[in-house]
């Protein structure tokens, strides 16, 4: 089977822009879906991408369609609506989804794509927009190994760690576990940093201590940078997305008969913050949000 030459990209946001930029840099033809957020789209068009009006048009013009959207509801809309990916799917098309999505939704989409004579793989990603721009994302892949090998040259444009996790939906299942871990660390770290600050502890000294021991983590360093230097650039991940990802994890666990008391508490904290107006703020600001909750208790 020939390697894909025509790539379509649906979702040119914080992560999608870097993905598209690196695909173009390697000489692939790229079509992108029109979006009201003009900046990233126009930048890619200026680099040689073609802007198309509907997911159907993107699918029809592509050998490989990569989707990078916010949640399963958005993904299902892009696939199943009248002018969606399914309407433009053709024999030989491969759809690769980077979304952090619910595995049961993934399986439904994969089955529909297969009925069109096309193929589906899930390739959710980790790391940040900085790594997307640098072409150094981590991909957790689920699907047929031969299909993934076929699109590997494209994936190598924007990822430097690609791990095959199993059949279709395995990538999304691994991603939910990964995000539960990282976002759980984030909430614990925010609470610990607030307690340290309120207790008069020198946060720089605390960072030095934690950095030299087993409690250190990338998430700790990112939140500590915000608490100490007000640096909110190291983790550009919205609180609303954090709440969604942990909710997806608990939904997956329900189907596995796994109790999730810790995940439920973490989800409640992120969801409360989102509902109080902090939905679009980045996760490190949970240090401030927890502080404001404690002020209200006085």
At which residue positions do the language-model features occur?
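Helical "substrate-binding/catalytic lid" subdomain
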Residues: 169-294
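Hydrophobic residues within alpha-helices
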Residues: 19-23, 109, 154, 195
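Rossmann-fold NAD(P) dinucleotide-binding segment
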Residues: 55-119
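Hydrophobic beta-strand scaffold residues
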Residues: 30, 51, 120-121, 162, ...
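Rossmann-fold dinucleotide-binding core
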Residues: 100-183
């Amino acid at each position: 089977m020939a390697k894909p030459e025509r790539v379509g990209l649906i979702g040119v946001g914080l992560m999608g822009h870097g993905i598209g930029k690196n695909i173009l840099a390697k000489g692939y033809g790229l079509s992108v879906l029109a979006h009201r957020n003009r900046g990233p789209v126009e930048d890619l068009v200026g680099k040689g991408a073609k802007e198309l009006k509907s997911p159907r048009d993107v699918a029809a013009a592509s050998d490989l369609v990569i989707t990078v959207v916010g949640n399963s509801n958005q993904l299902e809309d892009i696939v199943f609506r009248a002018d969606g990916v399914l309407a433009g799917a053709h024999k030989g098309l491969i759809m690769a989804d980077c979304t952090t999505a619910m595995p049961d939704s993934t399986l439904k989409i994969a089955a529909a794509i297969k009925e069109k004579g096309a193929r589906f793989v899930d390739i959710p990603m980790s790391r940040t927009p900085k790594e997307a721009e640098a072409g150094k994302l981590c991909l957790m892949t689920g699907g047929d190994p031969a299909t993934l090998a076929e699109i590997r040259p494209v994936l190598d444009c924007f990822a430097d760690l690609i791990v095959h996790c199993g059949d279709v939906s395995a990538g999304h299942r691994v991603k939910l576990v990964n995000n539960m871990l990282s976002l759980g660390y984030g909430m614990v770290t925010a609470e610990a940093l607030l307690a340290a600050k309120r207790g008069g502890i020198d946060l720089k000294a605390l960072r030095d201590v934690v950095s030299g021991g087993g409690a250190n983590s990338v998430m700790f360093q990112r939140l500590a940078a915000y608490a100490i230097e007000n640096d909110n650039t190291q983790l550009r991940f919205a609180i609303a997305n954090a709440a969604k990802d942990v909710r997806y994890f608990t939904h997956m666990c329900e189907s596995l008969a796994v109790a999730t008391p810790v995940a439920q508490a973490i989800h409640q904290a992120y969801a409360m913050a989102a509902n109080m107006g902090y939905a679009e703020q980045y996760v490190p600001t949970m240090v401030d949000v927890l502080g404001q909750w404690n002020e209200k208790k006085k």
